[in-house]
Design a protein with these regions (language model features):
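Class I SAM-dependent transferase core
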Residues: 2-81, 85, 115-130, 135, ...
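Residue-level signal for inorganic ion chemistry
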Residues: 43, 98, 120, 181, ...
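Conserved SAM/SAH cofactor-binding pocket of Class I
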Residues: 67-156, 164-165
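Helix-to-beta-strand junctions that scaffold the AdoMet/dcAdoMet cofactor pocket
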Residues: 102, 171-173
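Short "lid" loop at the C-terminus of a central beta-strand within the Rossmann-like core
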Residues: 139, 159, 182-186
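Conserved beta-strand signature within the Rossmann-like core of class I S-adenosyl-L-methionine
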Residues: 174-184
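SAM/dcSAM-binding transferase cores
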Residues: 188-242
Length: 242
């Protein structure tokens, strides 16, 4: 027998979003929840023509993309009005959900694929999220916008030494690189690479999203300027990690 599929109307979907965030001790209002509903619908529709995500079922999008993007930032002290860059943002995670919940932040989203950047522009306009979308390779942008942001973030599968070289150059001295990682990665193994880039490991914290999936948060503090030779070109970053 096939499982019965429950179809929710718009008000029920709004309530569902609010309840899933509440499970993570995050309070959002109906207006914010409605933005998440609209974002999900738009992303799933757009995904038919541009590869954005393999997760398209509403309840899974809410937990595995939306809550997953916001929850780790509740564990870090982020002052009002902070500027940040989401490096290799893809479909806009974690940046867009974070900006829905923290509209005081000044977000820049960087991606190397123009098709995704077009989607990001349209998605942000649709739900009324202010952001700067930049089509660029992150290692090239990291030389142009060097030490310009209060924090950088990435929700990526790349190993921590690779991710650190892409992200830490963007961060002001005294700022943070907030990495959203899987629990399988040993963050301490990247401490040497992080030090070469002007950072030090401040916090590593394991947690779970509402469905029980395990996650690891790594917070890197920028304690000195990144040497001008970093970031290297992408071939060296990935083939010869620090």
């Amino acid at each position: 027998m096939e499982a019965e599929v429950t179809i929710m109307d718009n008000s029920e979907r709004i309530e569902f979003v609010i309840s899933e965030f509440r499970k993570a001790d995050i309070n959002i209002d109906e207006k914010q929840a409605d933005k998440f509903v609209k974002l999900c619908d738009f992303m799933v529709e757009y995904n038919e023509n541009v590869n954005l995500t393999s997760i398209t079922e509403f309840s899974e999008v809410v937990v595995k993309h939306f809550v997953d993007s916001v929850l780790p930032f509740t564990m870090v002290d982020i002052p009002q009005g902070s500027s940040f860059i989401d490096v290799g943002t893809g479909a806009g995670f974690p940046a867009i959900p974070l900006l829905i919940c923290r509209p005081d932040l000044k977000g820049t989203l960087c991606d190397s694929l123009n098709k995704r950047c077009v989607y990001l522009e349209k998605a942000c306009e649709l739900i009324g999220v202010k952001s700067e979308i930049i089509h660029a390779r992150s290692e090239e942008l990291g030389r142009k916008k060097r030490e310009c942001f209060d924090f950088a973030t990435a929700r990526a599968v790349a190993a921590m030494p690779v991710l650190s070289e892409y992200c830490i150059p963007f961060v002001k001295v005294g700022g943070k690189f907030i990495a959203l990682k899987s629990v399988n990665e040993d963050i301490s193994a990247a401490s040497g690479a992080i030090a070469k880039l002007g950072g030090e490991i401040e916090t590593v914290r394991d947690y779970a999203i509402p469905n029980g999936d395990a996650r690891r948060l790594a917070v890197i503090k920028k304690i000195s300027q990144t040497p001008t030779k970093y970031p290297r070109n992408s071939g060296n970053i990935s083939k010869k990690p620090l």
